[in-house]
């Protein structure tokens, strides 16, 4: 077997062998299709650098596929080095491959171990560059140096071993094409909001916009597509190359694409493939729901057909349908041998499923791209250049859809492709590694050592998930993903991982919006909310009779949608509310599209005239559907809209599922009980005895407060007790109140004042007795006599003069006698003996707490 076949996923380990018989070629060969896309190309022999030594790429592929790969490539005469790493998230775990034998028997090859042959990376020396290349069958992919310099790499027709054919994207002349949305559009997108990204007044603990999402993708190749390739191996190679570009396109939006399965209708088509894309989409979605989804769980399925659709349409999908079991899919025409053209078309349809609308014309949705015709992936039509990037409008639309509750199935982390050998720096945590943040130049994780792929000292986790903060695991129960609407449920950290658990929502049929709707696929929208999303704040549902009259007519102003042939379908009176949206008031112009026609009509209701107005919205030439009511909208007591028909809500099984929760919980999207606080899963029958952390915190706070109050009361009681004891003991009390500063030394005691002041002093303070003799009084007695207030005249005779003591027993030295006689006793003193007021400038008298010193030798101070 040729070398290319050995490596073009030769690549397969365990599992059933892939079909290798030649397939009849009824759709035209790759060589024939390439004739219509001729453009200036240049062959080139790439080289692989190992230890800075150039080795032939062909020689490297004969041995093994290294995980880090450096390729030396010449572009426009200049040598460039591509620094690449294997994309290990492209094929998670073991994908499912399906094909059919000649007798119609389906062959399912599960558990294949694919050797990873797809790489992503950058060009050395070019900031903002990116590379997406597969080596499954030669060297194929895309190299973007700058927005103005982008190249595609393709293998020549029939030559899988030769050098790749390199073309500038500007030299690719693809046929003009457009996209048509199906009439079953399930959400109403808006024009870009005026506020820039990141300025919404919504606080999130972990922004769902920045959290990585993963789309589990299944690609189905119809019979005409399968006939273009010699065997299943070649078809698988091309599918991997397309899926790699899809992942590259969506990666800047924090959305990863993982190929979980490939099915090829190798013998015949399993549904009718019509030139009308609406018919093909309708048939494919019915087959997906009934046959594909039960045996191969996934988020989105994309049909690739070799049949040409009528007109310029190359694809069709349903707006905002991701995660829906009924509508999450699209159909795509393989209109080019270039993988870039096909991948860009599939990315466009997958973008519609994610809630992305067509970009507005003009410069309102800027997008970097090759000059002069800078095109974005979500443009309604591209005449020449395929889009390589999503515009700012697409980013805002995805943000709005996520915050509205879309995409609950996208938050599940999938197992990556098993590694051939652990390699530190590939950004995948492998056996023996605690973390992997890439090479030294790329690593921005402060918790991870990029040289050893081990956590730094003291770190518990790598900061690659919302449950890790400052290199420490968040506690179990910390909310890592808040609710995003009435039908969403919060997620909490497990306590032993940095990753947030998969997103779950309320189960289908659980009531929301105050009973005006029920949850469907994790979303809730009442009729009023849908009107406001189309006509702005203040819009309300039209009068019931106006609504019923319009939708039962089945025309452009009102219907229950279109059938695959394009004609309008009238609603029955019972189903009228589940048909086209009929609103009143609000804006004069809708937020989506424009008014093509306006119809006014007066209806007689039991003799009363009712004025009704209906509009025919122009949503663009490539969008051929009215805006219909969302599934889950209430249409009567116990009735909701399902498949645009008013049906009983119990068909959704919510009540049956809720009965398993025994009245203490509700059902989630996995049909499990989400128990109320205080009740334990799985059936909410066991009441938790442990108090919550909040209750525990409150009890501890009250206990601390009680201890502080008791300590304060004890201190106050002790102080009062001491004061009472001092009052009882009098001058001998050993306790005194705190003083702000040293007390002034009092003058000599006056007998009259001493008798009168003792009572006053006892009420003021009680200084402690001195522990040693006091020093001599530094203030002269003459000055004391001048400053002291005169006492009242004595009321009884003075005592006899004291006996003069010897000098040894005398106290302080006798002060000099006054120079002049003291004044006579003043008249008119206050008989009460009160001290002068503060205006006299005389300090108040302080009575000493120690015994008075011996009196002077004179018998009176007034002599």
UniProtKB/Swiss-Prot annotation:
Phosphotyrosine sites (modified residues): 715, 735
Keywords assigned: Angiogenesis, Cell adhesion, Cell junction, Cell projection, Cilium, Cleavage on pair of basic residues, Collagen degradation, Cytoplasmic vesicle, Disulfide bond, EGF-like domain, Flagellum, Glycoprotein, Hydrolase, Membrane, Metal-binding, Metalloprotease, Phosphoprotein, Protease, SH3-binding, Signal, Transmembrane, Transmembrane helix, Zinc, Zymogen
Chain residues that bind Zn(2+): 179, 348, 352, 358
GO CC annotations, alphabetized: acrosomal vesicle; adherens junction; cell surface; extracellular exosome; extracellular space; motile cilium; plasma membrane
Propeptide: 18-206
Extracellular compartment residues: 207-696
Cofactor(s) the protein needs: Zn(2+)
Sequence motif: SH3-binding, positions: 815-821, 850-856
All residue ranges annotated as the Peptidase M12B domain in the record: 213-414
Post-translational modification: The precursor is cleaved by a furin endopeptidase.
Entry comment describing in which tissues the protein is expressed: Expressed in colon and small intestine. Expressed in airway smooth muscle and glomerular mesangial cells (at protein level). Ubiquitously expressed. Overexpressed in atherosclerotic lesions. Constitutively expressed in cultured endothelium and smooth muscle. Expressed in chondrocytes. Expressed in airway smooth muscle and glomerular mesangial cells.
Pfam families recorded: ADAM_CR, Disintegrin, Pep_M12B_propep, Reprolysin
Motif stretch (Cell attachment site): 484-486
Compositional bias per record (Basic and acidic residues), positions renumbered to this chain: 35-44, 779-789
Subcellular localization(s) per the UniProt record: Endomembrane system; Cell junction, Adherens junction; Cell projection, Cilium, Flagellum; Cytoplasmic vesicle, Secretory vesicle, Acrosome
UniProt keyword Disulfide bond, yes or no: yes
Topology of the protein relative to the lipid bilayer: Single-pass type I membrane protein
Domain of life: Eukaryota
Cysteines engaged in disulfide bonds, as pairs: 323-409, 365-393, 367-376, 480-500, 657-667, 661-673, 675-684
Glycosylation (residues): 237, 389, 392, 606, 611
Sequence ranges assigned to domain Disintegrin in this UniProt record: 421-508
The protein's enzyme class: hydrolase
Subunit structure: Interacts with ITAGV-ITGB3 (vitronectin receptor). Interacts with SH3GL2 and SNX9; this interaction occurs preferentially with ADAM15 precursor, rather than the processed form, suggesting it occurs in a secretory pathway compartment prior to the medial Golgi. Interacts with ITAG9-ITGB1. Interacts specifically with Src family protein-tyrosine kinases (PTKs). Interacts with SH3PXD2A. Interacts with ITAGV-ITGB1. Interacts with GRB2, HCK, ITSN1, ITSN2, LYN, MAPK1, MAPK3, NCF1, NCK1, nephrocystin, PTK6, SNX33, LCK and SRC.
Described purpose of this protein according to its UniProt entry: Active metalloproteinase with gelatinolytic and collagenolytic activity. Plays a role in the wound healing process. Mediates both heterotypic intraepithelial cell/T-cell interactions and homotypic T-cell aggregation. Inhibits beta-1 integrin-mediated cell adhesion and migration of airway smooth muscle cells. Suppresses cell motility on or towards fibronectin possibly by driving alpha-v/beta-1 integrin (ITAGV-ITGB1) cell surface expression via ERK1/2 inactivation. Cleaves E-cadherin in response to growth factor deprivation. Plays a role in glomerular cell migration.
Protein name: Disintegrin and metalloproteinase domain-containing protein 15
The encoding gene: ADAM15
């Amino acid at each position: 077997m040729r070398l290319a076949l050995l490596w073009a996923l030769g690549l397969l380990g365990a599992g059933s062998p892939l079909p290798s018989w030649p397939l009849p070629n009824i759709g035209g060969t790759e060589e024939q299709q390439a004739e219509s896309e001729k453009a200036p190309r240049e062959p080139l022999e790439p080289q692989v650098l190992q230890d800075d030594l150039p080795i032939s790429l062909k020689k490297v592929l004969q041995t093994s596929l290294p995980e880090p790969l450096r390729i030396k490539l010449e572009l426009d005469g200049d040598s460039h080095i591509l620094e690449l790493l294997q994309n290990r998230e492209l094929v998670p775990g073991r994908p499912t491959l399906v094909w059919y034998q000649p007798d119609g028997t389906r062959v399912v090859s599960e558990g294949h171990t694919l050797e990873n042959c797809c790489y992503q990376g950058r060009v050395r020396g070019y900031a903002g560059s990116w590379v997406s290349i597969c080596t499954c069958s030669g060297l194929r992919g895309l190299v973007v140096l700058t927005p103005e310099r982008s190249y595609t790499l393709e293998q020549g027709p029939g030559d899988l071993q030769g050098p790749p054919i390199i073309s500038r994207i500007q030299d690719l002349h693809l046929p003009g094409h457009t996209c048509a949305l199906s009439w079953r559009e399930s959400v109403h997108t808006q024009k870009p909001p005026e506020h820039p990204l990141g300025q919404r007044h919504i606080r999130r603990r972990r922004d769902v916009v920045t959290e990585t999402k993963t789309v589990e993708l299944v690609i189905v190749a119809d019979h005409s597509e399968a006939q273009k390739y010699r065997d299943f191996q070649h078809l698988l190679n091309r599918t991997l190359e397309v899926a790699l570009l899809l992942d590259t396109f969506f990666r800047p939006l924090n959305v990863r694409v993982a190929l979980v399965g490939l099915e090829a209708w190798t013998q015949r088509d399993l549904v009718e493939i019509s030139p009308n894309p609406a018919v093909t989409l309708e048939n494919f979605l019915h087959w997906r729901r009934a046959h594909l989804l039960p045996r191969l769980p996934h988020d989105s399925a994309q049909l690739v057909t070799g049949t040409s659709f009528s007109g310029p349409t190359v694809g069709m999908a349903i707006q905002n349908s991701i995660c829906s079991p009924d509508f999450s899919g699209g159909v795509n025409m393989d209109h080019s041998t270039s993988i870039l053209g096909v991948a860009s078309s599939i990315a466009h349809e997958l973008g519609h499923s994610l809630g992305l609308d067509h970009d507005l014309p003009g410069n309102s949705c800027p997008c970097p791209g090759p000059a002069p015709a800078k095109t974005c992936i979500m443009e309604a039509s591209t005449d020449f250049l395929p889009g390589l990037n999503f515009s700012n409008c697409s980013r805002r639309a995805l943000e709005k859809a996520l915050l509205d509750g879309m995409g609950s199935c996208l938050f599940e982390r999938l197992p990556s492709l098993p590694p051939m050998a652990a390699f530190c720096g590939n950004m995948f945590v492998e056996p023996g590694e605690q973390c992997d943040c890439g090479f030294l130049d790329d690593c921005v994780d402060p918790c991870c050592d990029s040289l050893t792929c081990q956590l730094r000292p003291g770190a518990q986790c790598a900061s690659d998930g919302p449950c890790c903060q400052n290199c420490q695991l968040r506690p179990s129960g910390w909310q890592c993903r808040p609710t995003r609407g009435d039908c969403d449920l919060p997620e909490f950290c497990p306590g032993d991982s940095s990753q947030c658990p998969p997103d779950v929502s309320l189960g289908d049929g659980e009531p929301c919006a105050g009973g005006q709707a029920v949850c469907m696929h994790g979303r809730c929208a009442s009729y009023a909310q849908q009107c406001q999303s189309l006509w702005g704040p203040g819009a309300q549902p039209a009068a019931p009779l106006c609504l019923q009259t319009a939708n039962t007519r089945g025309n452009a102003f009102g219907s229950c949608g279109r059938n695959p042939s394009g004609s309008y379908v009238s609603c029955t009176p019972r189903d009228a509310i589940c048909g086209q949206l009929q609103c009143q008031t609000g804006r004069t112009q809708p937020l989506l599209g424009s008014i093509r026609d306006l119809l006014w009509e007066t209806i007689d209701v039991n003799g009363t005239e009712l004025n009704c107005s209906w509009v025919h919205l122009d949503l663009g030439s490539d969008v051929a559907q009215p805006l219909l009511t969302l599934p889950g909208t209430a249409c009567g007591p116990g009735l909701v809209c399902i498949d645009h028909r008013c049906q009983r809500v119990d068909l959704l099984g919510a009540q049956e599922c809720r009965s398993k929760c025994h009245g203490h919980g509700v059902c989630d999207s996995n049909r499990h009980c989400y128990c109320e606080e205080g009740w334990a899963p799985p059936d909410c029958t066991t009441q938790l005895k442990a108090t919550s952390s909040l209750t525990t915190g409150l009890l501890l706070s009250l206990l601390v407060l009680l201890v502080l109050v008791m300590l304060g009361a004890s201190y106050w009681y002790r102080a009062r007790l001491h004061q009472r004891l001092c009052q009882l003991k009098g001058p001998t009390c050993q306790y005194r109140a705190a003083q702000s500063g040293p007390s002034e030394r009092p003058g000599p005691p006056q007998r009259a004042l001493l008798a009168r002041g003792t009572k006053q002093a006892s009420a003021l303070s009680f200084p402690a007795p001195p522990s040693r003799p006091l020093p001599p009084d530094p203030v002269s007695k003459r000055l004391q006599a001048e400053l002291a207030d005169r006492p009242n005249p004595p009321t009884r005779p003075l005592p006899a003069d004291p006996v003069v003591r010897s000098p040894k027993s005398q106290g302080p030295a006798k002060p000099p006698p006054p120079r002049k006689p003291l004044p006579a006793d003043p008249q008119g003193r206050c008989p009460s003996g009160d001290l002068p007021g503060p205006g006299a400038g005389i300090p108040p008298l302080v009575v000493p707490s120690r015994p008075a010193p011996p009196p002077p030798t004179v018998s009176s101070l007034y002599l």
